[in-house]
Amino acid sequence: MAGKFYKGLKNINWYATTTEGAKELSKTFLTGSDFRLLFYLLSNINDDNQVKLNNYENIGNEINMTKTTIKKSIMNLKANEIIAKDIDEVKTLFINPKFFYAGNHKQIEEKQSFFDKCYKEYLDNKSKMTTNNKNTN
């Protein structure tokens, strides 16, 4: 493609958002810190909608946030179904393609199915932890 906006552009990394996702995000109660962390994660998204997690201290140094704030923001992003732990990769988060996606748009359904599987496992584990805590009290 040649034209005004394509001259000399090489290997641009990008992600897209959906209008549905943007509308849902506007209705959340995410904090400024949550959004800051989200955009940090999006700046590191790969074509599979994954983000390899650096340790919280390094992330904190990059975006000027404490480890505690990062942990809270990750919990908030999970609670709002924006991210989930990738069940196939260690130290990796998966971004919900309903909100943001990278790579081929033709794989959105496949990515959404995988996110749903990851998120279900997160909910199942959360439920087990709640049940275990009730049983120990």
Placement of each model-derived feature along the sequence:
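Short, amphipathic alpha-helical interaction segments positioned at domain boundaries
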Residues: 100-130
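Winged helix-turn-helix DNA-binding recognition segment
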Residues: 33, 44-101
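N-terminal intrinsically disordered, low-complexity, charged/polar
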Residues: 1-11, 126-137
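Short secondary-structure transition/capping segments
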Residues: 41, 85, 132-134
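Charged/polar, solvent-exposed surface patches and flexible loops
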Residues: 23-28, 39, 61, 72, ...
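Short recognition helix of helix-turn-helix/winged-helix DNA-binding domains
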Residues: 1-50, 54
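Intrinsic disorder/low-complexity detector
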Residues: 15, 36, 57, 98, ...
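Short alpha-helical interface patches
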Residues: 19-26, 82, 100-104
